């Protein structure tokens, strides 16, 4: 399993958002129990496994930053047709069984009505709240995409510079504060494998006790993993920003955020104000969930999230 909440795979190319026809309560007339069904499925999985939040956060991020939030990441590859899942950095994305279960239940109650893209959005939102994060509304009405091509996946690694990150987020209208909220918010839960932060283990600026701990943890076989948030690894809170200030960031991008003059004050604001962080993270998630969405007659409503209808 690769890094559970690898939001550090910052994107290179993003498409403009399409906001038309998305609205709160989109399914009130066609499938009233849609959001409650998804919420119940998510809770049942989260109650057994608290890493569900990290898994769904990563899933939504990796889906939305590649040609928009259209559930293209959910398509299974075949021998004749590879998909976004075929790309190495998507190999560790998990939680698909949660989406499958919700979709199966929804098809029994409201056939061909609720999109897989909306299920991912609702499920991620609910998992964040379960992990102590902000509760927020999301607009629905997304359609599922008709394309899932490995060549569309343009992802950078965890050593990306702040300047590169700012440029990428700016291309879709995200400001610096929103970027910091998304990166830190994604890293407040989940793990990173040792191969992804070898540069940090060698960094003398890292907290010496943590560096010694990481060296010991990474001696094991099969690329061991460690929590990115060493103090509250299953809670969506502002603790990750406190650790950045204390030179305890696991990933290079997180350490860069506190060292770069354009983001340092934002990290500090979030570190000492959990309410501010939660509000900013909720707003960032709402905005990210509307990147490049398909609405109206575009795309389709899949009956199986892992395969196109035709």
Swiss-Prot record:
Binding site for Ca(2+) 2: 188, 229, 232, 237
Cofactor binding note of this UniProt entry: Binds 1 heme b (iron(II)-protoporphyrin IX) group per subunit. Binds 2 calcium ions per subunit.
Residue numbers annotated as active site: 62 (proton acceptor)
Disulfide cross-links: 31-110, 64-69, 116-305, 194-218
Keywords in alphabetical order: Calcium, Disulfide bond, Glycoprotein, Heme, Hydrogen peroxide, Iron, Metal-binding, Oxidoreductase, Peroxidase, Secreted, Signal
Signal peptide coordinates: 1-20
CDD domains: secretory_peroxidase
Protein location: Secreted
Binding sites annotated in the UniProt record for heme b: 187
Broad EC category: oxidoreductase
GO molecular function: heme binding; lactoperoxidase activity; metal ion binding
Record site: Transition state stabilizer: 58
Reported cofactor(s): heme b; Ca(2+)
Record-level GO BP terms: hydrogen peroxide catabolic process; response to oxidative stress
EC number: 1.11.1.7
Zinc-finger as UniProt keyword: no
Entry binding sites for Ca(2+) 1: 63, 66, 68, 70, 72
Catalytic reaction list: 2 a phenolic donor + H2O2 = 2 a phenolic radical donor + 2 H2O
Residues that carry a glycan: 49, 175
Family: Belongs to the peroxidase family. Classical plant (class III) peroxidase subfamily.
Entry function: Removal of H(2)O(2), oxidation of toxic reductants, biosynthesis and degradation of lignin, suberization, auxin catabolism, response to environmental stresses such as wounding, pathogen attack and oxidative stress. These functions might be dependent on each isozyme/isoform in each plant tissue.
Miscellaneous note of the record: There are 73 peroxidase genes in A.thaliana.
The protein's name in its UniProt record: Peroxidase 8
